[in-house]
């Protein structure tokens, strides 16, 4: 067999500007294979070096990067350390765009890093006033919109645990997931758009509340721009009313392995199984993938086609930690044209498209 031709290869000048090249040089490696071998032979040294390279900030440093490295089931990472996931995703500031939202109906909006930081502070204070504390669960039944990211970061900032589903999930599918984790607060939208149609979400929300009695507050995002009636939904608050304007941004420091996200298996063999992802592991793994493997930085505009019900949403949002502008798209990828995402890529000057 003949080797397939190389489609593209970076020149030496471009290669030397990448984060991977700089990281290898810092660790005195000239060959990627040697770097890889070191990363699996000296695992603790590799992850310590990555923390330094990516400026991971521990409020309490670890006693040791890795304890009992030979056994995956008993290994303990960065024991004794504390940090904040939200603090790392919100460490950038200024008027540069943090989030750009695009909808299939042509809607477009932007949030700067400063605006994002303030919005997270306001919602976090609303959560505190609602009695949400460390270890409580907060859930989102939301379109792929900026409010979903704000609610997640606000949740993480106080040490609570986030879980989300896309609004195209049916009532039973959402109850099977959220019902297992006993959430205290539900963030939802009045509806969403898909393939040119506006779909009501509040009927499903009523069904969720009838089946999940742990939910104490329901916060509604007015996503569709249409008037809605929700007086019959218990303890309902409008997004703007729930946010406590002018709050200070604070970050609760938590253990490295403190739960950050609850995600789910597909549910094809029974009720979906809960999968917990920790604060430190999620942050480090995403930084490794973004910074080393994709060379993402503050000059990038990062997009991945996803919904809030897929793990790639969580992966996309972590691009904020590298200072990238993340692009959200909600709706059908083929509405009005089968090239709608490519047109968006051109208009938004995307540098990473997934």
Residue ranges and their predicted role:
Residues 105-106, 262-274, 290:
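Conserved adenylation A10 loop of the ANL superfamily
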Residues 19-21, 25-27, 86-115, 225-230:
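AMP-dependent adenylate-forming
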Residues 281-301, 311-351:
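Conserved AMP-binding/adenylation subdomain of ANL enzymes
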Residues 124, 137, 143-171, 181-186, ...:
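A short helix-loop-beta submotif of the ANL/AMP-binding
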Residues 33-38, 99-153, 170-175, 231-241, ...:
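Conserved AMP-binding/adenylate-forming core of the ANL superfamily
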Residues 142-143, 163-179, 191-193, 197-201, ...:
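ATP-dependent adenylate-forming carboxylate-activation enzymes
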Residues 95-97, 218-220, 231-264, 271, ...:
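Conserved pre-ATP/AMP-binding loop-to-beta segment of ANL
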């Amino acid at each position: 067999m003949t080797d397939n031709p190389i489609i593209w290869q970076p020149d030496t000048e471009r290669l030397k500007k990448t984060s991977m090249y700089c990281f290898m040089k810092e660790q005195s490696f000239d060959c990627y294979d040697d770097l890889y071998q070191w990363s699996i032979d000296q695992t603790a040294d590799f992850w310590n070096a990555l923390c330094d390279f990516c400026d991971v900030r521990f409020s309490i440093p670890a006693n040791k990067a890795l304890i009992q490295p030979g056994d995956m089931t008993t290994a303990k990472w960065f024991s004794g350390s504390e940090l904040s996931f939200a603090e790392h995703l919100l460490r950038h500031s200024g008027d540069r765009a943090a989030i750009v939202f695009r909808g299939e109906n042509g809607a477009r909006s932007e949030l700067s890093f400063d605006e994002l930081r303030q919005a997270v502070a306001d919602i976090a204070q609303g959560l505190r006033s609602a009695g949400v504390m460390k270890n409580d669960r907060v859930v989102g039944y939301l379109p792929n919109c900026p409010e979903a990211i704000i609610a997640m970061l606000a949740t993480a900032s106080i040490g609570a645990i986030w879980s989300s589903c896309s609004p195209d999930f049916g009532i039973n599918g959402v109850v099977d997931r959220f019902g297992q984790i006993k959430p205290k607060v539900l963030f939802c939208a009045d509806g969403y758009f898909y393939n040119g149609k506006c779909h009501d979400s509040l009927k499903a929300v009523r069904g969720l509340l009838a089946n999940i009695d742990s939910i104490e507050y329901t916060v509604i995002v007015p996503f569709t721009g249409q008037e809605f009636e929700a007086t019959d939904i218990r303890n309902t608050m409008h997004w703007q009313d729930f946010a406590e304007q002018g709050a200070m941004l604070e970050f609760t420091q938590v253990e490295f392995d403190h739960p950050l996200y609850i995600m789910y298996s597909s549910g094809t063999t029974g009720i979906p199984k809960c999968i917990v992802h920790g604060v430190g592991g999620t942050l480090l793994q995403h930084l490794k993938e973004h910074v080393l493997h994709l060379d993402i930085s503050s000059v990038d505009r990062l997009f991945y086609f996803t919904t809030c019900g897929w793990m790639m949403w969580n992966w996309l949002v972590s691009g904020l930690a590298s200072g990238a502008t993340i692009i959200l798209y909600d709706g059908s990828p083929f509405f009005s044209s089968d090239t709608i995402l490519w047109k968006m890529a051109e208009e938004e000057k995307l540098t990473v498209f997934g």
